């Protein structure tokens, strides 16, 4: 049983699922769902369509260069059945999957390192610019008065300390 890759989104196409388009030059295109097939017929570029794996890899959102990705390559050479080889392969697949998940986590952490601080800055800036939208006008006036009173109290305290 061979699991093919969708030509458009690079998702898995299981046997008996999806659509296959064969061009006049015998080039085969497999699609996992009608969404991919329609986008292909509309001549859309998978690298410019935001939800495809091609876009994600091109824009640095997924790992592109890693040794664990080479285990997924398509191999056309048939191998004689050997029970021990199959068992070793299954064990290796599990080990490779764990390594791949660990590397993907670190890749994601490195990618998201400065994002939280940047988002917080943007939110605070937006709040300061649109303060009148958050609070009603009467509450805003009271808040401004309270800020002025606090500023006056601070000035009085500093002047009394200087005089003594």
UniProtKB/Swiss-Prot annotation:
- An example molecular function term from Gene Ontology annotations: structural constituent of ribosome
Q: Per its database record, what is this protein's job?
A: Involved in the biogenesis of the 60S ribosomal subunit. Ensures the docking of nog1 to pre-60S particles. Activates and recruits ATPase AFG2 to cytoplasmic pre-60S ribosomal particles.
What PANTHER family does the entry give?
60S RIBOSOMAL PROTEIN L24, RIBOSOME BIOGENESIS PROTEIN RLP24-RELATED
Q: Lineage in the entry?
A: Eukaryota, Amoebozoa, Evosea, Eumycetozoa, Dictyostelia
Q: Give the GO biological process terms.
A: ribosomal large subunit biogenesis
Question: Subunit structure, per the record?
Answer: Associated with nucleolar and cytoplasmic pre-60S particles. At the end of biogenesis it dissociates from cytoplasmic pre-60S particles and is likely to be exchanged for its ribosomal homolog, RPL24.
Q: What is its main location?
A: cytoplasm
Q: Which family does it belong to?
A: Belongs to the eukaryotic ribosomal protein eL24 family.
Q: Which top-level group of life is the source organism from?
A: Eukaryota
Keyword annotations of the record: Cytoplasm, Nucleus, Ribosome biogenesis
What is the name listed in the Swiss-Prot or TrEMBL entry for this protein? Probable ribosome biogenesis protein RLP24
Q: Which SMART domains match?
A: TRASH (SM00746)
One Pfam family per UniProt: Ribosomal_L24e
């Amino acid at each position: 049983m061979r699991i093919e890759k969708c030509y458009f989104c690079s998702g898995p196409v299981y046997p008996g699922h999806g659509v296959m388009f064969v061009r006049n030059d015998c080039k085969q295109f497999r699609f996992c769902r009608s969404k991919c097939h329609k986008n292909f017929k509309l001549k859309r570029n998978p690298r410019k369509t935001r939800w495809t794996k091609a876009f994600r890899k091109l824009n640095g959102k997924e790992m592109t260069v890693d040794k664990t990705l080479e285990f997924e390559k398509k191999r056309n050479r048939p191998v004689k059945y050997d029970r021990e080889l199959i068992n070793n392969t299954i064990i290796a697949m599990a080990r490779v999957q764990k390594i791949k998940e660990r590397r993907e986590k670190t890749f994601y952490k490195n990618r998201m390192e400065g994002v939280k601080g940047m988002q917080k800055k943007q939110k605070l800036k937006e709040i300061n610019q649109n303060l009148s939208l958050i609070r009603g006008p009467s509450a805003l006036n009271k808040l401004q008065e309270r800020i002025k009173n606090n500023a006056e109290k601070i000035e009085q305290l500093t002047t009394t300390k200087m005089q003594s």
